[in-house]
Design a protein with these regions (language model features):
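A structural micro-motif
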Residues: 8, 75, 106-108
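A non-catalytic structural micro-motif
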Residues: 72-79, 114
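Surface-exposed aromatic
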Residues: 44, 79-83, 124-128
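Catalytic His-Asp segment of secreted/periplasmic serine-dependent ester chemistry enzymes
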Residues: 86-150
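Conserved SGNH/GDSL esterase-like catalytic core that processes O-acyl groups on lipids
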Residues: 1-66, 72, 84-93, 97
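Secondary-structure boundary elements
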Residues: 70-71, 105
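Residue-level recognition of beta-strand->loop/alpha-helix junctions
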Residues: 14, 81, 112-114
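A structural signal for isolated positions on well-ordered beta-strands in alpha/beta enzyme cores
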Residues: 41, 76-78, 109
């Protein structure tokens, strides 16, 4: 996915196993300084599942968005909902509704690309995941083609 993101004109600042607090630390240490972004896609929080409550995740994302807006005030920000996880599909769906409302409240667009990773049953499409949590190449292709980078 990294190559697709970069060829679409985005700088990919994501790291495997990142949580919201890791992104905040990097922002505090200059990751968004020294350039003017036109568009920013925020796709973080899945690794906070099981560690933090839904309220803490939404609050953390909201705080992160405000920090991004301070440092990149002209950028158009799109927030991606969390991807579903095996056994947590309904919890993620509820959480994404809260994230959508929070994004709108903060003047950000929202996209739920995770719903494209579900089978008709509402459970994850196992063919798109390595382990029920991490996407395989087919899952990455679904995300890249979802409108996330438009």
């Amino acid at each position: 996915m990294r190559g697709d993101v970069e060829s679409a004109g985005y700088l990919n600042l994501g790291y495997s196993s990142d949580r919201i607090e890791n992104v905040l630390w990097r922002i505090y240490h200059g990751e968004l300084d020294g350039y003017q972004a036109e568009k920013i896609v925020v796709m973080i929080g899945t690794n906070n599942l099981g560690i933090h409550s839904a309220e803490e995740i939404v609050d953390g994302l909201e705080f992160l968005l405000k920090q991004i807006q301070i440092r990149q005030p002209k950028a158009k920000i799109k927030v991606a909902g969390l991807f579903p996880r095996k056994g947590m599909e309904s919890d993620v769906k509820k959480l994404n509704k809260q994230i959508s409302k929070m994004a709108a409240r903060n003047g950000c667009d929202y996209i739920d690309v995770g719903k494209k990773l579900l089978a008709k049953s509402g459970k994850i499409d196992e063919k798109l995941f390595v382990d029920g949590q991490r996407l395989n190449d087919k899952g990455d292709a679904v995300i890249v083609g979802s409108g996330l980078l438009d």
